[in-house]
Amino acid sequence: MKVGIDAGGTLIKIVQEQDNQRTFKTELTKNIDQVVEWLNQQQIEKLCLTGGNAGVIAENINIPAQIFVEFDAASQGLGILLKEQGHDLADYIFANVGTGTSLHYFDGQSQRRVGGIGTGGGMIQGLGYLLSQITDYKQLTDMAQHGDRNTIDLKVRHIYKDTEPPIPGDLTAANFGHVLHHLDADFTPSNKLAAVIGVVGEVVTTMAITVAREFKTENIVYIGSSFHNNALLRKVVEDYTVLRGCKPYYVENGAFSGAIGALYLEK
C-alpha cells in the first residue's frame, strides 16, 4: 500500500493507493497522534508527506517517509485530478481554500505561488462561532444553506434603486453594509452564517480573479477542504467568478490534491 498525507493546520488529508484503487479519508489535526499510531500499524510500501505538520508525523513513525513542499504537491495532485476528470486546461490559477487561502499560477509546466490571504475555512469556523456559538463545521455549513443575506449585505442594486448601475447590480457593494438599514430585522443564525460564507467566497474569488487577469488566463480552479459539505460557498464562488468574467472549475476530491501529489513527486 502507498500512502500520501497532507497534514494541514486544521485537517489531515490521507490518500491510500492499492491495486490501482484510491481511497480518501480525513482526520482532525488535533488527533495527529492517532494518525501516527495508525501508520505504525500498517504495512506501507511508500509513504509521502506534505503540509505544515508533515515533520511532526515523520518524527514519530517507525517507517521512512519523504517530505515534499506543499505547493508543489498540491499542483502535482491537482494536475492528476484535472486530467482524470476530463479538464484539459492549458493554464490556470488555482485557489487552495483551506484554513486560509493560497493562490497559484500554473503555466502548463510548473506552478508558482502568486498570493495568499487569511480568508478561508478558518474564518468560517472562527467568525461563525462568534456569531452562532456553533463549533461543528458541518452544523455551521448546514445552517448557512438556509440563510438569506439580503438584509445583511449591501448590493449595488440597493444603492442604484431607480437608475441603471454602471456595474452589475448583484455585485456586493459592502459585506454586512445593509445591517444598519434593517435594525428591526430578525438576524437569524442562518442569515449571519450565510453572510460569513458570502464574504469568504467573494474575497477569495476577487483575489483569484485579480491574479488571473494579471497572468492573462480566464481559468480558475478551486480546491480545498473548505468546500466540503459547503454547497453555499461553492455557489457563491462559482456565481461570482462567472459574474466577473472568468471560468470556474471544481474537481472531485480536490482537497486531497496535496496528498495525491506527494505520492507522485520524486526526489
Curated annotation (Swiss-Prot):
Catalyzed reactions: (R)-pantothenate + ATP = (R)-4'-phosphopantothenate + ADP + H(+)
Protein activity control: Not regulated by feedback inhibition by CoA and its thioesters as described for many other pantothenate kinases. Competitively inhibited by N-pentylpantothenamide (N5-Pan) and N-heptylpantothenamide (N7-Pan), although these compounds can also act as substrates, being converted to inactive CoA analogs which inhibit a number of cellular targets, especially fatty acid biosynthesis.
One Gene Ontology cellular component annotation held by this UniProt entry: cytosol
Any matching Pfam family: Fumble
Residues at the catalytic site: E70 (proton acceptor)
Pathway membership: Cofactor biosynthesis; coenzyme A biosynthesis; CoA from (R)-pantothenate: step 1/5
InterPro entries reported for this sequence: ATPase_NBD, Type_II_PanK, Type_II_PanK_bac
Localization per record: Cytoplasm
Keywords recorded for this protein, A-Z: ATP-binding, Coenzyme A biosynthesis, Cytoplasm, Kinase, Nucleotide-binding, Transferase
GO MF annotation list: ATP binding; pantothenate kinase activity
One Gene Ontology biological process: coenzyme A biosynthetic process
Entries under SUPFAM superfamilies matching the protein: Actin-like ATPase domain (SSF53067)
Residues passing through the membrane, by range: none
EC number: 2.7.1.33
Task of the protein: Catalyzes the phosphorylation of pantothenate (Pan), the first step in CoA biosynthesis.
Summary of subunit composition and partner proteins: Homodimer.
Name of the protein in its database record: Type II pantothenate kinase
Name of the gene this protein is made from: coaW
